[in-house]
Amino acid sequence: MAESTKGDAAIFPVDTRFQQMARRPGGVPRERALDGAQRHIDELKPDFNHWLSRELKQLATSIQQVGDNPGDEAVLELAHQACRQLRDVCGTMGYELVTFIADNFCEILDAIKAGATYDQNVVDCYMDALALARTDAYRKLRPEQVPEMTNGLRRMVELAVASAPRDVK
């Protein structure tokens, strides 16, 4: 059996493919790329309210189908997908409160997927909160500016997650 030698291991970083691509010559300078992206977002904002209305209607339709049959995984996945899209796009567009509500609603849907009880009152509360958050009075607010609402929504997530069955091994 060979004896091991004492010594320090040589640790060296290895660039990921993304890091290699980011450092390659050519391309667009970072600041110019960010300016271009922001300009594109600003161009999309006038049509955003129409998009948001359409997405909320789609989410409401999906949620109605989940309410009709909470055990249907395909219907639940469609609702979850609509909610995730709402969360992601609203985050990009700067609608922090809508993003917060949609993110918490995604957690509720995750809990239902994990076996938590479907509670129509919780779902209605989240849909009402989304409708309120998209109004002119609430649109530009951050979650910390409406603590009563956000604390209540967080509490509902905690209860939903706690009600999901846990795998005991």
Give a label for each model feature.
Residues R30-E77:
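Long, amphipathic alpha-helical coiled-coil segments characteristic
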Residues P46, H50-S53, K57, E77, ...:
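Generic structural signal for well-ordered, non-transmembrane alpha-helical segments
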Residues A2-P25, M127-R166:
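Structural secondary-structure packing elements that flank or coincide with functional cores
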Residues D47, M93-E96, A137-K140:
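Residue-level signal for short amphipathic helical patches enriched in basic/charged
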Residues A74-A111:
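Extended, amphipathic alpha-helices with heptad-repeat/coiled-coil or helix-bundle character
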Residues A74, A111-D124:
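Histidine phosphotransfer helical core of two-component systems
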Residues L59-P70, C90-M93, L109-I112, A137:
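Secondary-structure edge/capping motif, primarily at the C-terminal ends of alpha-helices
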